Amino acid sequence: MPKPHDNDHMPFPVLVGDIGGTNARFWILMDAHAAPKEFANIHTADFPTIDQAIQDCILDKSGFQPRSAILAVAGPIKDDEIPLTNCPWVIRPKAMIADLGFDDVLVVNDFEAQALAAASLGRNDREPIGPLTETSLNSRVILGPGTGLGVGGLLYTHHTWFPVPGEGGHVDIGPRSDRDWQIFPHIERIEGRISGEQILCGRGILHLYNAICAADGIEPVWTDPADVTQHALKGNDPVCVETMTLFVTYLGRIAGDMALVFMARGGVFLSGGISQKIIPLLKSPVFRAAFEDKAPHTEMMKTIPTFVAIHPQAALSGLAAYARTPSSYGVKHEGRRWQR
């Protein structure tokens, strides 16, 4: 009978998976030193279950039989059946062990995987935002504006990295400047409040764009966040430019808040496709100015480096780092790991 298990080591080969709402991504690690065997992204809508997707696209095509699986998922991990956010798949670790031949299955939060990546990304996998280019062995934070706003902490103590998942994307965000006070009344509230995720995600770009249009009494032109971003980068639509300037400002504010919470002297990392697409905007003075504007701690904030994670598979990289050297990380297993 599969059961929760507390031993750190997971036997190789190990399948690592990053399961999102639209795509699932997988690598197989044959041992602790070999380069990962990579596979094409799987569209979750193409398969009724994750088990069938793994069987058809990974096991049958590769000819490998992993002994372990480490899966990062967007959704609460509460019991033996783990429903995913924005995807009809359900993770059933016991069934995976019985039907797919695994001996060991560990399921973690998606931003735990991103936090693990923040501990292991090399210089070529991160783009500095601002004048500071080096990290240090200190606590870190990773934020990812995407479908929502993910936030993860990474504490460093006793020579070990401890990922700290949470719901930091749902902290309050409010107006500070005169322009903010004009715009914020037009942003949709959830039960009377505006959280970071209402603005700092894909749909949040559109919320912000529409609020600016409403504040200025003009008709919106664009209905796709990608269009707003594209025209801001080109600089050919002033409303789009203001939208993304404010997006970067608010992202800097929240990133600075999270840096203070975790005392993230080791760096703050921005992950995901949106962050990668808007690197030119993030490199403007706006982001760092908002990030550092945390009186009475402005001088300290100037010493904290900020980066965009540009590794194409950052979450898988983080999971792989953990699989190879589990003793370097303090990853909770209780209630999240099952063994044959």
From Swiss-Prot:
Domain of life (superkingdom): Bacteria
Keywords of the record: ATP-binding, Cytoplasm, Glycolysis, Kinase, Nucleotide-binding, Transferase
One MF annotation (Gene Ontology) recorded for this entry: ATP binding
Record: residues binding ATP: 17-22
Catalytic reaction annotation: D-glucose + ATP = D-glucose 6-phosphate + ADP + H(+)
CDD domains assigned to the protein according to its UniProt record, in alphabetical order: ASKHA_NBD_GLK (cd24008)
InterPro entries reported for this sequence: ATPase_NBD, Bacterial_glucokinase, Glucokinase
CC terms in the record's Gene Ontology section: cytosol
Localisation per UniProt entry: Cytoplasm
Enzyme class: transferase
Pfam families named in the record: Glucokinase
Gene Ontology BP term (one): glycolytic process
Gene3D superfamilies the record matches: 3.30.420.40, 3.40.367.20
PANTHER family: GLUCOKINASE
UniProt protein name: Glucokinase
Species the sequence originates in: Allorhizobium ampelinum (strain ATCC BAA-846 / DSM 112012 / S4)
